[in-house]
């Protein structure tokens, strides 16, 4: 569904949030994006397909409305699930689309290969049988890529070290998930801080500069200390640090906070409680431009996990270099 961004107002971190939308049984809120109704929207699914619609073709509903099934707007299969929404306008500056799968396969493809997509869709990336598309980002061709896993590790490398492939190619190994799965894809174009949030509601900002540059395919460095108390890492985003953050739970609760309220900690720390989930878990996080004239209140009594308890391991021990196995298919069209 579509709704105006001023529907949700800033609250203090650690709050309980408000009801964002009614949900069907076994459904969760996955993504919020900010765009103009006149922009095109590329819709990528877990099966590796891409569809295109206009922003104004998505009906506008109230805050608590369920919206309509995406299958009513695009010709996706009933077994497909939306994994990424990429808005773009005629004057966009993006040159490439960067893909990462749940198992850590990556691909970089020129943006113009996806500009002539209709509502019936086309193949965006080939996938292994046990894999699915996880994230897609638009880039300028010279970005730094950051990929994070559910185990709290992250890898950072230069985008231009990955050669461009055709629309239907499979890709190359980008991140060693080490028994977990990919939970985040970000670029340095989005900000100089890394925001991490765990499923039990702990969050923090860390300086992007704290993440050592490695090569694609590495296991990476610790980006958050994952424990039973914190739960798995569910969000990793690059931010400026002054945006608003919309946090959504599996139970349909939404809270909007200012990232000015989230302190900067070392990359191996766990952070502070940013949402009280109780018997719920965080399902997804969206970043929005800050509300004008929103009041930021310092709350010192919120639970903080002392970063001193979670010392960083030395970089030489923290990083395991990649193997060079590629899994590239031919670029022939399907």
What are these regions (language model features)?
Residues 1-334:
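C-terminal interaction appendages of subunits in large macromolecular complexes
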């Amino acid at each position: 569904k579509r709704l105006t961004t001023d529907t949700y107002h800033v609250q203090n971190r650690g709050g309980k949030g408000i009801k964002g939308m009614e949900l069907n049984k076994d459904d969760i809120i996955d993504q919020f994006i900010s765009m103009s109704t006149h922009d095109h929207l590329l819709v990528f699914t877990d099966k590796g397909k891409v569809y295109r619609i206009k922003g104004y073709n998505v009906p506008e509903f109230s805050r608590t409305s369920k919206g309509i099934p995406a299958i009513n707007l695009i010709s996706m299969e009933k077994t497909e699930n939306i994994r990424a929404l990429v808005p773009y306008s005629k004057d966009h500056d993006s040159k490439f689309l960067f893909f990462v799968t749940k198992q850590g396969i990556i691909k970089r493809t020129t943006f113009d290969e996806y500009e002539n997509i209709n509502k019936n869709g086309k193949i965006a990336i080939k996938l292994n049988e046990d894999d699915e598309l996880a994230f897609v980002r638009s880039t300028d061709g010279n970005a730094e890529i950051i990929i994070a896993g559910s185990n709290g590790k992250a890898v950072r490398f230069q985008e231009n070290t990955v050669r461009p492939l055709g629309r239907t190619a499979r890709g190359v190994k980008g991140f060693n998930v080490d028994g977990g799965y990919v939970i985040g894809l970000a670029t340095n174009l989005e900000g100089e801080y890394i925001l991490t949030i765990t499923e039990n509601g702990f969050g923090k900002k860390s300086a992007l500069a704290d993440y050592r540059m490695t090569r694609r395919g590495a296991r990476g460095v610790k980006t958050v200390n994952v424990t039973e108390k914190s739960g798995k890492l569910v969000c990793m985003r690059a931010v400026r640090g002054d945006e608003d953050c919309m946090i959504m739970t599996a139970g349909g609760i939404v809270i909007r906070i200012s990232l000015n309220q989230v302190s900067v900690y070392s990359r191996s720390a766990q952070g502070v409680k940013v949402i009280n989930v109780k018997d719920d878990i965080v399902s997804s996080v969206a970043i929005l431009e800050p509300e004008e004239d929103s009041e930021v209140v310092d709350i010192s009594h919120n639970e903080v996990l002392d970063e001193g308890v979670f010392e960083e391991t030395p970089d030489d021990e923290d990083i395991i270099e990649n193997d060079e196995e590629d899994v590239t298919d031919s670029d022939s069209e399907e």
